[in-house]
Design a protein with these regions (language model features):
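Beta-strand-rich modules
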Residues: 672-692
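Pro/Thr/Ser/Gly-rich low-complexity, intrinsically disordered linker/stalk tracts
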Residues: 593-636, 677, 691-712
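Helical hinge/lid and interdomain linker segments adjacent to catalytic or ligand-binding clefts
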Residues: 754-891, 991
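A glycine-rich, often tryptophan-bearing local segment used as a flexible ligand/cofactor-contacting loop or short
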Residues: 835-944, 955-958, 962-964, 1000
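Active-site microenvironments of hydrolase-like enzyme catalytic domains
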Residues: 395-399, 412-510, 542-565
Length: 1010
């Protein structure tokens, strides 16, 4: 009997399975139709598949594979999908109702996420939790603005993908991804995060924690109470000074060795210090520690502090950083984050200038002093440094293998090595018995987030650093190519289950990560389509068990922005403007997700101001004017106030001052600042609102001579606002980037460039990371920043002009064209054209023309009033007579521009690539030393690959400079109708020697003054 029953059950199950398979087969055409319709509706490609279709009474329940969850779903789309699915039922199933829908075992309605919002209010979210108010954040800058609608008090864990690692199998250090299109993923994703995303989060009030070194500075100075190692590789010893009643606080950091091996933890090799706190109004003398930097060369250095977290640690440790721009004060909550590196900020320090960090036991004003608390102190670190973690193949048979360090900046290395240097538990970064650093690296990043948050409200049941992490994001690029060179696009990944559990340690449902991933992906795609490419591909939103999205203790996602293997994607990927757009989109996605999560309003930080200028006012006043820039995508990004930053002479910019009541006229804002003769004053502005502050504007500078001709003032116009990727060529068989033609212009500096591309044959496929086929590039320049457009050349020119005895003011090119008052009283206009050039992006959008119609009109107005002109730039002829990028110039505009150059400025084009050796000599003078300019990429100033030959256009002009190697005319002087011009086919600011800059501008000014 038993056997009979079992047989019947088996047969029934078999029949059920068979019946289901028939139904699934019957619905295949339906799935195909839905796949097409979904793509038409959402633009997302997929292949909808059913795993099972179950009859339940007179209803059909659909169990789709993960293919359903891989698509974005909003409430109206979900409703449309149900209606469309029912309408497509085959005839034989038309009598059935549509029942439940699942993606694997997830109910369809759980996949629905709220739409991206733009009006500043949180969307209704099923994953909203009580607002978490981090009232005592890990790090807070004192006297800084608080952004109630930004990310104030939020802690965000963020990392760029991969990094240099030691491969035990091949016994060498190598990249985790291939070198393609002048970069590799290990370095490429940094170029979005470090210069853009991180400062945007910080400008909104958030604090960023990273498992990879964020500072590209190769020098590293450590000041500590313990003896510190100093040796080769940019490692230097700072000075430690201690005053007051400090006592031993137990084990702490010490840098005792040239290299660290295995899982050695430098935070256990030394000691730390402690002192009882006193209140802000205490009459006791405060105890103090000073860590002196003694930096070896001027530059920007990240500052990290360390301390010990004890049961009675203070929540208000008062640190002060003294740097070239002044002093910046911080309050650090030492109840969390002990025995690791805690980042305060990046500051400019000068060689042989006082630079230090101090810590006092006095509680800062405005912070409550808790009785019986202590402040602790350990080492302070300045600069990122060079990697000092040595690795080797693990011995299996007693044989000793060679040990080596990467030899690269620590910022180029994988997370596994920084985590060791930062005192992380070896269980986090060494999970494979020292046999596989590749696995250790990707396994460590998400686990590190959990280690940081252990013991906090976000992760209360685990031990850790007690830092509440609000969210985490791993920023990657993907592989893959398209046969028609179309865009691969953007993929988002989250993980619904970790160890079979759908809850985060805080109790939240992990489905909140889908909402996070969808919002970030939506924001990226929408912004790219609006600003760069209307056809940008939105890929799927995956629920997959990737380590970086699975193990963090907070809402988390992994982003695959684009394909670093696809040429079409990388045309955008190397464009700094694209990187800014993406960085801003990711920041906005984080902001809007946290708004939904906590149910709080938001405001997007403003864009930088435009039309900026500085001019002479009354009685030694400088008048700074600017225009606010509204964001057409984000209505909440309108500015409500402004901050002005000031630099005097060779100093650094100060911490900024809020402009209380700026004047406004005709849409231009203005403020007056006192200035003194004999000094160069430089200014930049940032706009702010309740959501944060913008990136700084370009720099404008002004100076009044102590002696000289104060009546003859020079207006410096920065007509060099280009930022772009390198020149490229694109044919059916050959394509690539061509740095010999033009290497592009980074924004400030490029940290992604590793070497030039050498393989341009499209048909070559990837064979290995060492032989990656089309796009293959050298990596000999990895870790060396490439200087770009600093937007700070008015001070360079102005310094030479001031030495020559003339005053100067400056403005942007937009301000020069739009504000006719700036030229009034200007004896000469010094037009900085730098490496300005008409360029086009991958979709044909053109920008950065040197002599636009507006610029030509402005110069004509100036010369018509007897004003002189100095023009210098690498492409002042090429951009008129020729082209570098595949741009389209209207015939009438080209002819108009040629006539302008010849008749107004007095020159004609003699050709590009006028010099290979980049050496200039005075015309007709063979005895004078040659003047050199930068023609190869370097870390100091942008380079000029192809200077222009500039010849006299008429008998009223004559050559004054020529290129030494070719004899081609490099510059001319011209006598116009009541005015004079000097035009140079190279940028003055790229000259290698400051004395040469002085000499060239003095030569120009002398002729104009004759």
């Amino acid at each position: 009997m038993k056997k009979t029953i079992i047989t019947i059950i088996i047969l029934a199950l078999s029949w059920t399975s068979y019946a289901q398979s028939i139904i699934v087969e019957d619905f295949k055409p339906v799935c195909d139709s839905l796949t097409r319709l979904i793509q038409e509706r959402t633009t997302v490609k997929g292949a909808l598949k059913t795993k099972a279709i179950m009859k339940r009474g007179n209803s059909l329940d659909f169990y789709f594979t993960e293919s359903l969850g891989d698509l974005p779903w909003y409430s109206e789309d979900a409703k449309w999908f149900r209606n469309t699915l029912k309408s497509l039922f085959p005839e034989e199933y038309s009598q059935y109702k549509l029942g439940e829908i699942y993606s694997r075992r997830v109910a369809f309605n759980r996949l629905v996420t709220p739409h991206l919002t733009y009006e500043g209010q949180p969307a209704e979210s099923s994953h909203r939790i009580a607002k978490f108010n981090n009232g005592r954040p890990l790090v807070r800058k004192m006297d800084s603005q608080k952004f109630s609608k930004g990310l104030d008090g939020r802690n965000i864990a963020l990392w760029q993908s991969h990094g240099r690692y030691y491969d035990q199998r091949s016994e060498r250090w190598r990249w985790q991804r291939p070198c393609l299109f002048q970069t590799c993923e290990d370095m490429f994703t940094q170029s979005f995060i470090i210069p853009y995303l991180v400062p945007m989060i910080e400008n909104a009030g958030g604090y960023v924690l990273m498992p990879r070194e964020r500072d590209i500075q190769i020098n590293e100075i450590i000041a500590d109470n313990d003896t510190t190692y100093a040796g080769e590789g940019g490692r230097f010893i700072g000075r430690y000074e201690e005053n007051g009643s400090w006592t031993d606080a137990g084990a702490g950091f010490a840098d005792t060795k040239a290299i660290y091996t295995g899982t050695e933890n430098p935070f256990t090799l030394g000691t730390s210090r402690q002192c009882n706190t006193i209140s802000s109004d205490s009459r006791k003398t405060a105890a103090k520690i000073i860590w002196n930097a003694d930096v070896p060369e001027r530059g920007e250095y990240a500052v990290y502090v360390s301390y010990k977290t004890l049961p009675k640690s203070t929540t208000a440790a008062h640190y002060t950083v003294h740097h070239l721009g002044g002093e910046t004060e911080f309050v650090v909550n030492q109840k969390m984050g002990g025995s690791t590196w805690i980042y305060l900020g990046t500051f400019e320090f000068g060689k042989d200038k006082e630079g230090w960090v101090s810590l006092t036991n006095r509680t800062p004003k405005g912070y409550r002093s808790e009785a019986g608390t202590v402040v602790t102190a350990d080492a302070v670190r300045f600069g990122g440094g060079i990697g000092n973690i040595a690795r080797q193949r693990k011995s299996q048979d007693g044989e000793e293998y060679a040990m080596s360090v990467s030899g690269m900046p620590r910022s180029a290395e994988a997370a596994r090595y920084w985590l060791q240097w930062a005192g992380t538990d070896p269980k986090i970064y060494s999970q494979n018995e020292e046999e596989d650093d590749y696995k250790d690296d990707y396994m460590s990043r998400g686990d590190w987030v959990t280690w940081l948050s252990g013991g906090s409200a976000m992760n209360p049941k685990q031990e850790g650093k007690r830092i509440p992490i609000d969210l985490s994001l791993g920023f990657h690029s993907d592989a893959g190519v398209t046969p028609n060179d179309s865009i691969i696009g953007t993929l988002a990944i989250y993980t619904l289950k970790s160890e079979g559990i759908q809850k985060l340690p805080s109790g939240e449902n992990r489905m909140t990560s889908r909402e996070f991933a969808d919002i970030v992906q939506s924001q990226i795609v929408n912004d790219i389509r609006a600003q760069h490419d209307s056809l940008w591909s939105r890929r799927q939103i995956w629920d997959r068990a990737y380590r970086e999205s699975r193990t963090p203790s907070c809402p988390s996602m992994l982003l695959e922005l684009l394909s670093h293997q696809n040429f079409a994607d990388m045309k955008y990927g190397l464009d700094p403007a694209f990187r800014f757009t993406v960085g801003r989109a990711v920041y906005k996605g984080m902001l809007k997700y946290l708004s939904n999560r906590y149910g709080v309003p938001y405001a997007v930080q403003p864009l930088p101001v435009e039309d900026i200028s500085v001019s002479f006012g009354q009685k030694s006043k400088a008048v700074i004017k600017w225009r606010k820039k509204l964001d057409p995508i984000e209505p909440t990004a309108a500015p409500t106030g402004y901050i002005i930053y000031t630099r005097v002479d060779e100093g650094a910019f100060d911490n900024g001052k809020v402009i209380e009541t700026p004047m406004e006229k005709d849409g231009l804002m203005s403020v007056e600042i006192d200035i003194m003769p004999g000094h160069i004053y430089s200014f930049r502005l940032a706009a702010f609102n309740d959501g944060g502050k913008s990136f700084p504007s370009e720099v404008v500078s002004i100076g009044i001579p102590e002696e000289g001709d104060s009546e003859k003032n020079v207006l410096i116009v920065n007509n060099f606002d280009r930022i772009s990727g390198p020149a490229y060529f694109d044919t059916p068989n050959y394509a690539g980037f061509d740095n010999t033609l033009d290497s592009g212009v980074p924004h400030i500096k490029d940290i992604a460039f590793i070497g030039e591309m050498y393989q341009n044959r499209r048909k070559l496929d990837w064979m290995s990371d060492d032989n990656p086929g089309f796009g293959a590039s050298f990596d000999d320049k990895a870790g060396i920043p490439v200087a770009g457009n600093s937007f700070d050349y008015a001070a360079v020119h102005g310094k030479a002009i001031l030495k020559a005895g003339y005053g100067f003011s400056s403005c942007s090119n937009e301000a020069f064209c739009n504000d006719t008052t700036l030229c009034s009283g200007a004896w000469t206009v010094d037009l900085i054209c730098g490496k300005q050039l008409t360029v086009t992006d991958a979709r044909g959008h053109q920008n950065f023309t040197i002599f636009t119609s507006q610029m030509q009109d402005a110069i004509r107005r100036h010369t018509a009033n007897g004003g002189n002109v100095i023009v210098s730039g690498a492409y002042i002829g090429t951009d008129i007579w020729d082209l570098v990028y595949p741009v389209r110039i209207e015939k009438d505009f080209r002819q108009q521009s040629i006539e302008f150059a010849q008749n107004v400025l007095g020159y004609k084009w003699q050709g590009g690539f006028a010099s290979k050796k980049a050496r200039i000599v005075p015309y007709g003078d063979t005895a004078t030393r040659a003047i050199e300019f930068h023609n190869v990429q370097n870390s100091d100033v942008y380079c000029v690959e192809a200077p222009d030959g500039i010849a006299p256009a008429s008998s009223s002009a004559q050559t004054i400079l020529r290129y030494e190697d070719t004899g081609v005319s490099a510059g001319i002087k011209n006598q116009g109708n009541g005015y004079r011009t000097v035009c140079l086919g190279f940028p003055i600011e790229t000259l290698k020697n400051e004395d040469d800059i002085d000499a060239i501008l003095s030569l120009c000014l002398t002729f104009l003054a004759e």
